[in-house]
From Swiss-Prot:
It holds the Pfam family Ribosomal_L27A. Belongs to the universal ribosomal protein uL15 family. One of its GO terms (cellular component) is cytosolic large ribosomal subunit. Part of the 50S ribosomal subunit. Keywords: Ribonucleoprotein, Ribosomal protein, RNA-binding, rRNA-binding. SUPFAM superfamilies: Ribosomal proteins L15p and L18e. The keyword RNA-binding applies. It comes from Methylacidiphilum infernorum (isolate V4). This is Large ribosomal subunit protein uL15. The gene is rplO.
Length: 150
């Protein structure tokens, strides 16, 4: 097959609907808009949810609840088990991203207590769980909490 033999699949190219081009075309006179009325006029589209002046459904039903997700802080969870064998003494976000423990967009880092830790590390993170704090201090490590900026 040569490049000049390539043709689009049947039905792949659809002709534009030409309206107002004579009665026999099937789209003449009113151009498929029917007779009179708001939808027949130019710019005669009505917004979504408009019910002709009647109180719209979205305003008729009661409003309930509240959420504060806009201000929620999403921490990247890091377990102590993931930190085994790290040679550096100071563990911060840049190091965790460099070794691939933390990936993606997060508001901060939270150290969780799953696993054991033997070496004394200094953690510069945004949050620490109670069990992780206990294990870190037991191993002789320190925790420096960073204030997270959402």
């Amino acid at each position: 097959m040569m490049l000049n033999d390539v043709r689009p699949a049947i039905g792949a190219k659809k002709r534009k609907k030409r309206v107002g081009c004579g009665e026999s075309s099937g789209h003449g006179k009113t151009s498929g808009r029917g007779h009179k009325g708001q939808k027949a006029r130019a710019g005669g589209s009505i917004r979504i949810g408009f019910e002709g002046g009647q109180m719209p459904l979205i305003r008729r039903i009661p409003k309930r609840g509240f959420n504060n997700k806009l201000f929620h802080v999403f921490y990247a969870p890091v377990n102590l088990s993931a930190l085994q064998g790290i040679q550096q003494e100071v563990i911060d976000e840049s190091l965790l991203r460099q070794i691939g423990v933390v990936k993606g967009k997060w508001d901060g880092i939270k150290i969780l207590g799953k696993g054991e830790i033997t070496q004394a590390y200094t953690f510069k993170v945004h949050a620490v769980s109670a069990s992780a704090k206990e294990k870190i201090e037991k191993a002789g490590g320190k925790i420096e909490l960073i204030k997270s900026t959402p």
